Structures are given as structure tokens and as C-alpha cells.
Swiss-Prot record:
GO cellular component: membrane
UniProt subcellular location: Membrane
Keyword Hydrolase: no
BP-aspect Gene Ontology terms: DNA damage response; response to antibiotic
Key words, A-Z: Membrane, Transmembrane, Transmembrane helix
Gene this chain is encoded by: ykfM
Membrane topology: Multi-pass membrane protein
Transmembrane segments: 10-30, 52-72, 96-116
Record keyword Transmembrane helix present: yes
Protein name per UniProt: Uncharacterized protein YkfM
Main location, first listed in the record: membrane
Species annotation: Escherichia coli (strain K12)
């Protein structure tokens, strides 16, 4: 293989490992993981969409894929030799990527009704929505909505 072909391969993998996958993972984190964490934390105001579960497991899958691409980039740049340990590490990262991708596609939609049930029993939609709608803001039961903001602090300050 010519040197310029190896250089092109290395630069494309380096671009994916350093720029593309971290940017993609950041978007998955802020759209999938962070809102689900607010549900786990029992926040007073949450944003819920059942597809966030798919994004959460997709975040884990693409994190392992990013590690896999970084390992391959290091191997391509000849910084480490290809040994049994390195081969094992690359095999494990691609297997974990596929496992979490399978969970995101198959199991996450099956878990979604249970999370939706939890949201419906402990929260109510803030707005004119009746029922569960994708991308709705919910607040804890017993609290009032005021233009999408929680007005409990204002009510306690008036009394």
C-alpha cells in the first residue's frame, strides 16, 4: 500500500475518532441521557419522550464505537503493535457496540411503556396536552403550570 493511501485512511479515522463521534455522542447525551436522568432524579419538571430510551442506549453503543475507532486509529498510526491484547480489546469494543445497539433497537421500545406508565402516574402534562405526547413537559402531580414554568415558588411566596 502506498504511503498516501495509508495517510488518507489514518486521517479519515482520526477525523471520525476526534470530531464526528464525540459530537454525535454529545447530541445523544443531551437529547437522551440527560432528560432520562431527570426522571430518575425525580425532578419536579421533566421533559419526556419515549424515544429517549432508544437514544440513551444508542449513546452507550456509539461510545463503545468511538473507543473502537480510537483503537483502530492508534493501530493504523503504528503507535502500538497489533498484539493479542489489542485484538481482544478491539473485539470486545465492537461486541459491546453491537450489544447496546441491539438493546436500543429491540429492548428499549419494550421498556418504554413502563417508563411512560411511571411518568403518567407521577407527573401531569404542562400545557393543553391530554395524555402522553412526544416531547411534552411534565411536572409533578399537585403542582400548577404557568406558561410552562412551575408556579409553586410563586404560590408559596404570596402566602
Amino acid at each position: 500500500m502506498r504511503l498516501h493511501v495509508k495517510l488518507k485512511e489514518f486521517l479519515s479515522m482520526f477525523f471520525m475518532a476526534i470530531l464526528f463521534f464525540p459530537a454525535f455522542n454529545a447530541s445523544l447525551f443531551f437529547t437522551g441521557v440527560k432528560p432520562l436522568y431527570s426522571i430518575i432524579k425525580c425532578s419536579t419538571e421533566i421533559f419526556y419522550d419515549w424515544r429517549m430510551l432508544i437514544l440513551c442506549f444508542g449513546f452507550m453503543s456509539f461510545s463503545f464505537l468511538n473507543i473502537h475507532v480510537i483503537l483502530l486509529t492508534i493501530i493504523k498510526s503504528f503507535l502500538i503493535k497489533k498484539t493479542k491484547v489489542v485484538n481482544f480489546a478491539t473485539d470486545i469494543t465492537i461486541q459491546l457496540t453491537l450489544i447496546f445497539l441491539l438493546i436500543a433497537i429491540v429492548i428499549a421500545p419494550l421498556i418504554a411503556p413502563f417508563v411512560t406508565g411511571y411518568v403518567n402516574t407521577n407527573y401531569h402534562p404542562c400545557g393543553n396536552n391530554t395524555g402522553i405526547f412526544p416531547g411534552a413537559i411534565y411536572i409533578k402531580n399537585g403542582m400548577k403550570c404557568n406558561n410552562g414554568y412551575i408556579s409553586r415558588k410563586e404560590d408559596s411566596a404570596v402566602k
